[in-house]
């Protein structure tokens, strides 16, 4: 039996009435973490009050240093370990105090650590029956025997396409199903082979009805085969099975009875004013690296941990835009580790001890799960926009520029409109999010909205650095950066976001972004073209000169020649945002040259297995138009 290194350690802790929490076993070796700290994390406050509690915490966390030269591969070489911990309390009349409390943990590099819950439950039950090290040894062998050799390795762009698609067969050609799935002797001879006409070889057919967003495998433990579904669309900053929707619902106030925030004003957090939505305040705090505590007094530690993990996803744009949040996350921690916590800049931590609420110097933002309120610490430095500062200057310049507009009667009117715009942009975004949740949109759709929001923010920050800080503009065919209806809209956006952009530019995630962006641009298959910008033009601008539209389609054609280019191109057209529909408008353009180029682009995309699925998902109106025009040229 081949052992992989899916799991690094198995831990076992117990609560002793005389000694307190103690670490009893570490297998196969010691973790290197202080045993007292480990046992305290494995047996969280109040766990004995519940029959079962799941906890998540991290090991090997280092104070982040984005300036270090070593490049770390997050999936394979990262020292960060995620710990899935199960605490069980069993009432026993023969035990002192009438109960036995034990905790068993799996330490893994896998972000999808929740897949180990079923086997951990079985192992814990076995350990209560037979409390020996052999139980941990057999568990270690079972989880590391899980076969992932057939699991497809998606590129970043492929993963984003799969993530944004509801098509269960997307990338099906990359899967090799296990021969074990064809072991039915009754009809094996009938269906085990077919002739592939393209190659002339016999092949096994793929199993039908599988959701290719997951890889199916199994863990065999003590003779029991446990089916496992590994999510294939997980991004680097997404850990566990948290819910962003639950985070939003918990901290969204009743609008009809919301008097506005009573928190002290801070320009990084609530630029629009006291009616900033609490979730937007939290997002701004994440972007500007504030110290954040989630307090869940009386709540299971696992529930608190999931709020922390959801916040990490929120701030990172669900792992597609920024990174550096999970390395500063403490999904569950306690007073034993407070010194280590306070050494970490911009930590995001989950606690159940109400003592944290009293120590306002320990945190900048406190999110109380029980009350649904977000509090800004009175000790958070109150930063005023200084005269002549970058953030102040861009705001003043925008106001002065706008005040010269003939449509504005006075500076006062301009200022009022600008402030209203700053409120409206975020308020409209949150209204869209809440409406989607109310309409029962899924978790993936809600995460996608924050992914797009954070992406727009960092692209605006790039423009800010060029316009205000004097950094050189990025060279790109047909321009680079966000799209605005007019110059006034651009200045309003820069003014509204100046303070939090300045805050973000001082953070660890900003430094990582600079490195990652340089690497992405260097390794991109599509060079010298900002695809996102061109698609935004087709979506947002009402009137584009024919010459420019033609140039856009020609640029797309020139950059969708290889398979890798097609995949990268399609990743900019997520299907939950309409897929190819912005490009489909070209099929109806009054200019025959543009219709011709749009048709040529669609025909090229259709030759790709992935692109053909995008074509199938076109609206009926656009699909009929495409098929009719394609039939004429064949």
Predicted regions located by residue number:
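Short amphipathic alpha-helices and their capping/turn residues within compact interaction modules
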Residues: 15, 20, 26, 129, ...
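Amphipathic alpha-helical scaffolding segments
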Residues: 28-32, 119-129, 140-144, 305-318, ...
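N-terminal uDENN/longin-like adaptor modules and analogous extended polar/low-complexity scaffolding regions
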Residues: 2-302, 309
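A eukaryote-biased sequence property
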Residues: 280, 309, 321, 328-634
